[in-house]
Amino acid sequence: MHSNNKTLQRNYKDKFNKLIHEIKFRDNKKIFKKYQNLKKEIIAIIPARSGSKRLKNKNLYKVWGKPMIFWPISELKKSSYVKDIYVTSDSKKILDYAKDLGVKIIQRPIDISDDLTPKMKAINHAVEKILDKNKKKITIVISIQANSPEITKSQIDKCIEHLIYNDFSEVVSVDKNLSQNGAIRVMKYPYNFQETLSTNFGCVVTDILDIHTIKDVNKLNIEKHEV
């Protein structure tokens, strides 16, 4: 690597490191009071389309004895902050399963269900449907990836706390190399409608495995077995 590129890479990582903090959210009474005002307005949306190509029916593929989407839904239910959980999908099977788990469902139109449609387009379609139906104010929108079964309640809550504590516009999960992994994205409303990542953002290291293939599933199973 060219020396100038190495310098740029170091500067880039230094910048990101300044945005990654271990925080004691509940110790800050002022911020906790601010959260209390937001509590009923934090929603989580899981986009889960049916047309996966590399791993058929990926979002319902069983890992650790349960359909993959079960795990992020289960962890969201444990969250100290998330009020409502939604699954948006073009698949009746996925929507029926999500409904059986006790979460709210949104029918995703076919024209935004192909593999070229950006994830945020599905998220924002869901947000608009929620606003139209419930006439409720939304303060924070959380995008949770269905094919990231390693997501934990602790990671979700840490991202929410990080956003509120530092008054970020959004917080994203990143891997150990500080690259965005897409597993968790927490956004203040209406920053979710921006096409690009906000300049006022923070990140939380999660290093979550993103499942796309059988090889990924096997790696996940091995890692779980070794724990």
Residue map of PLM features:
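N-terminal nucleotide-binding beta1-loop-alpha1 segment
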Residues: 20-56
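Short beta-strand scaffold positions
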Residues: 88-89, 211
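Intrinsic-disorder-associated, low-complexity terminal segments enriched in Asp/Asn/His/Tyr and depleted
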Residues: 2-5, 11-14
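N-terminal glycine-rich phosphate-binding loop and ensuing alpha1 helix
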Residues: 41-88
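Hydrophobic helical membrane-anchoring modules
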Residues: 7, 16-25, 36-38, 200-227
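Conserved core of the sugar-phosphate nucleotidyltransferase
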Residues: 116-125, 138-140, 145-215, 222
